[in-house]
Amino acid sequence: MKKKTSLSEEDQSLFRQLMSGTRQIAQDTIVHRPIRKKVTEVPVKRLLQEQADNSHYFSDEFQPLLNTQGAVKYVREDVSHFELKKLRRGDYSPELFLDLHGLTQMQAKQELGALIAACRREHVFCTCVMHGHGKHILKQQTPLWLAQHPHVMAFHQAPKEYGGDAALLVLIEIEEWQPPELP
């Protein structure tokens, strides 16, 4: 960093002489621009509504018929089984992760609903839900809840790098992105 060069006594006196008789200008024309909200910012009320809307699909009474042999897996009727195979092989990598460790069943349902809403809002196709081993309550309930949701296309037990049998990789049906129409 350069040192400031100091003025000689002669230069300082010349500066003071030239500046005598001047007055300070008052700045009174400051314009403050209003702070704009980010366009991508979603209101909290809308987030809570999306979470509630997506979590009402999860019922504890309804027991969908899932394969109990081998790895936990599910594919919706209108989805190709090849998608499930690609999910199992690790062709899809999850972009969002949800950890359900330590949550109650009600909290877990709400978080699953919020995750599905976030995936659809952010156009995320694959996500990972970590239910853990624990007392096997969430491990048993999570696949049953996911199979009930209409936007869940498929899920499969996660590979080791994403949690193994303590996690699920989930494919979410997302809406096609449409660019906004210009006026």
From Swiss-Prot:
Subunit structure of this chain's protein: Associates with collided ribosomes, but not with correctly translating polysomes.
Pfam families, alphabetized: Smr (PF01713)
Function: Acts as a ribosome collision sensor. Detects stalled/collided disomes (pairs of ribosomes where the leading ribosome is stalled and a second ribosome has collided with it) and endonucleolytically cleaves mRNA at the 5' boundary of the stalled ribosome. Stalled/collided disomes form a new interface (primarily via the 30S subunits) that binds SmrB. Cleaved mRNA becomes available for tmRNA ligation, leading to ribosomal subunit dissociation and rescue of stalled ribosomes.
Protein name as catalogued: Ribosome rescue factor SmrB
Keyword Nuclease among UniProt keywords: yes
Molecular function per GO: RNA endonuclease activity; rRNA binding
Gene Ontology biological process terms in this record: rescue of stalled ribosome
Domain Smr: 98-173
UniProt cross-references to InterPro entries, sorted A to Z: Smr_dom, Smr_dom_sf, SmrB-like
Key words, A-Z: Endonuclease, Hydrolase, Nuclease, RNA-binding, rRNA-binding
SMART domains the UniProt entry points to: SMR
Keyword match Hydrolase: yes
Domain of life: Bacteria
UniProt EC number: 3.1.-.-
